[in-house]
């Protein structure tokens, strides 16, 4: 359980980190969206649903020198966005549409895999090579525990030194302001 919690916390820091933020934890290091400054797309004025057009804009924004190995790149999206994109493909009256409904397929946008990341915000995506994201952890990882006998809680603190960077910052496209209206059903409480 400790490793799962640490991986979740690190994923949150990698995605949402920003040293100018107000959250003590997230301000420890700049995350992938904060570090990306060259190719930033803003879809705030768009009202389109998740479709191929948002992915096309990311590919067009990527410098041509990196597109030679497009199949090695990834679109990192939220699970909701990945599901919405799969649903848009499933609406097609073709074998691809049928396959998206019947099987858990890996979806592609213009030859680039679309991968869901559990803590990715719904309104954002990241387009880059997986190996372009450099995440470093110092060897000295300290695990400390304490027990609060009154509340019967075991407290575990994991301390480590980390850093995050891009090997090639201009080989990253980030998008924000994407539509988050995923046609979710209205729930009522009794």
Language-model segments: residues:
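Long, contiguous amphipathic alpha-helices that act as assembly "spine/axial" helices in icosahedral shell
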Residues: 1-36, 66-82, 114, 141, ...
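Sequence/fold signature of self-assembling virion shell proteins
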Residues: 30-50, 86-190
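Hydrophobic alpha-helical segments and helix-packing faces
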Residues: 51, 55, 75-78
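Phosphate-interacting basic helix/loop segments used at nucleotide- and nucleic-acid interfaces
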Residues: 52-66
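Short, conserved, surface-exposed binding loops centered on an aromatic residue
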Residues: 63-68, 104-106
């Amino acid at each position: 359980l400790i490793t799962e919690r640490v991986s979740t916390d690190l994923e949150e820091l990698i995605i949402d980190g920003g040293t100018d933020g107000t959250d003590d934890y997230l301000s420890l290091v700049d995350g992938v969206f904060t570090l990306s400054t060259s190719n930033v797309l803003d879809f705030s004025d768009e009202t389109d649903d998740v479709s191929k057009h948002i992915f096309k804009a990311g590919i067009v924004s990527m410098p041509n020198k990196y597109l030679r190995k497009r199949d090695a790149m990834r679109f990192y999206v939220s699970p909701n966005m990945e599901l919405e994109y799969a649903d848009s493909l499933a609406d097609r009256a073709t074998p691809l549409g049928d396959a998206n409904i019947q099987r858990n397929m890996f979806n592609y946008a213009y030859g680039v895999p679309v991968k869901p990341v559990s803590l990715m915000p719904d309104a954002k995506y990241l387009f880059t090579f997986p190996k372009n994201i450099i995440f470093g952890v110092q060897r000295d990882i300290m695990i400390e525990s304490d027990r609060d006998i009154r509340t019967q809680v075991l407290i575990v603190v994991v301390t480590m030194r980390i850093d995050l960077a891009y090997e090639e910052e201009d080989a990253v496209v980030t998008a924000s302001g994407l539509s988050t209206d995923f046609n979710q059903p209205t729930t009522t409480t009794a």
